[in-house]
Amino acid sequence: MEEPPLREEEEEEEEDEAGPEGALGKSPLQLTAEDVYDISYVMGRELMALGSDPRVTQLQFKIVRVLEMLETLVNEGNLTVEELRMERDNLRKEVEGLRREGSAAGPEVNLGPDKMVVDLTDPNRPRFTLQELRDVLQERNKLKSQLLVVQEELQCYKSGLIPPREGPGGRREKEALFPRGSNANSNKEEKTIIRKLFSFRSGKQT
């Protein structure tokens, strides 16, 4: 009964050993947001090797846009899978509860179409709704993305790609990390996670 979790752990270890290039060999249905970031790293590295031709720069913007769309599709797909798993577990518990009720002596319980039997003593009983699960997964993916960007910034500092600058409240340092025009306002869209990772990881190859 414990074999499936072990197999999943072995697969994760193999994926880690494969490195960023391993994401390109995955099935589209198995991709995660982290795989999309690995793909952005590989593509950025390949583009840097082509030089600074204007056509390469134009191609880079198109690739970034495609990766952003892929990230959105992957996140939505992962949420759908988690929702289906939760619904499957709920249905299993409902069937088990109906079987117990049917075999036990006593009056028959008539459940409605949107009702399910939950054993309050079961430590594995469902405790969250599908919407709550969706919110948690979205927050988790957002935090993972932010962590990746922070790690890339730290690596750039350590390697000297981004020299720290003195300024009140670290304002100049933020401008070095995320340059903006002097007339930029609050309505201007900031870089997405994909764009940040693409630029940081590409910069390492220079």
UniProtKB/Swiss-Prot annotation:
<dbReference type="GO" id="GO:0003382">
    <property type="term" value="P:epithelial cell morphogenesis"/>
</dbReference>
<feature type="domain" description="RH1">
    <location>
        <begin position="19"/>
        <end position="108"/>
    </location>
</feature>
<dbReference type="GO" id="GO:0005829">
    <property type="term" value="C:cytosol"/>
</dbReference>
<dbReference type="InterPro" id="IPR034744">
    <property type="entry name" value="RH2"/>
</dbReference>
<feature type="domain" description="RH2">
    <location>
        <begin position="125"/>
        <end position="197"/>
    </location>
</feature>
<feature type="compositionally biased region" description="Basic and acidic residues">
    <location>
        <begin position="168"/>
        <end position="177"/>
    </location>
</feature>
<dbReference type="GO" id="GO:0031267">
    <property type="term" value="F:small GTPase binding"/>
</dbReference>
<dbReference type="GO" id="GO:0005737">
    <property type="term" value="C:cytoplasm"/>
</dbReference>
<dbReference type="InterPro" id="IPR021563">
    <property type="entry name" value="RILP_dimer"/>
</dbReference>
<dbReference type="InterPro" id="IPR051241">
    <property type="entry name" value="DZIP_RILPL"/>
</dbReference>
<comment type="function">
    <text>Involved in cell shape and neuronal morphogenesis, positively regulating the establishment and maintenance of dendritic spines. Plays a role in cellular protein transport, including protein transport away from primary cilia. May function via activation of RAC1 and PAK1.</text>
</comment>
<feature type="coiled-coil region">
    <location>
        <begin position="67"/>
        <end position="159"/>
    </location>
</feature>
<dbReference type="GO" id="GO:0036064">
    <property type="term" value="C:ciliary basal body"/>
</dbReference>
<dbReference type="Pfam" id="PF11461">
    <property type="entry name" value="RILP"/>
</dbReference>
<feature type="compositionally biased region" description="Acidic residues">
    <location>
        <begin position="8"/>
        <end position="19"/>
    </location>
</feature>
<comment type="similarity">
    <text>Belongs to the RILPL family.</text>
</comment>
<protein>
    <recommendedName>
        <fullName>RILP-like protein 2</fullName>
    </recommendedName>
</protein>
<dbReference type="Pfam" id="PF09744">
    <property type="entry name" value="RH1"/>
</dbReference>
<keyword id="KW-0813">Transport</keyword>
<dbReference type="GO" id="GO:0060271">
    <property type="term" value="P:cilium assembly"/>
</dbReference>
<dbReference type="GO" id="GO:0005929">
    <property type="term" value="C:cilium"/>
</dbReference>
<dbReference type="GO" id="GO:0005813">
    <property type="term" value="C:centrosome"/>
</dbReference>
<dbReference type="InterPro" id="IPR034743">
    <property type="entry name" value="RH1"/>
</dbReference>
<comment type="subunit">
    <text>Homodimer. Interacts with RAC1. Interacts (via N-terminus) with MYO5A, the interaction is required for its role in dendrite formation. Interacts with RAB8A; interaction is dependent on the phosphorylation of RAB8A on 'Thr-72'. Interacts with RAB10 and RAB12; interaction is dependent on the phosphorylation of 'Thr-73' on RAB10 and 'Ser-105' on RAB12.</text>
</comment>
<keyword id="KW-0963">Cytoplasm</keyword>
<dbReference type="GO" id="GO:1903445">
    <property type="term" value="P:protein transport from ciliary membrane to plasma membrane"/>
</dbReference>
<keyword id="KW-0175">Coiled coil</keyword>
<keyword id="KW-0206">Cytoskeleton</keyword>
<dbReference type="GO" id="GO:0016020">
    <property type="term" value="C:membrane"/>
</dbReference>
<keyword id="KW-0653">Protein transport</keyword>
<dbReference type="GO" id="GO:0051959">
    <property type="term" value="F:dynein light intermediate chain binding"/>
</dbReference>
<keyword id="KW-0969">Cilium</keyword>
<dbReference type="GO" id="GO:0046983">
    <property type="term" value="F:protein dimerization activity"/>
</dbReference>
<feature type="region of interest" description="Disordered">
    <location>
        <begin position="1"/>
        <end position="29"/>
    </location>
</feature>
<keyword id="KW-0966">Cell projection</keyword>
<feature type="region of interest" description="Disordered">
    <location>
        <begin position="161"/>
        <end position="189"/>
    </location>
</feature>
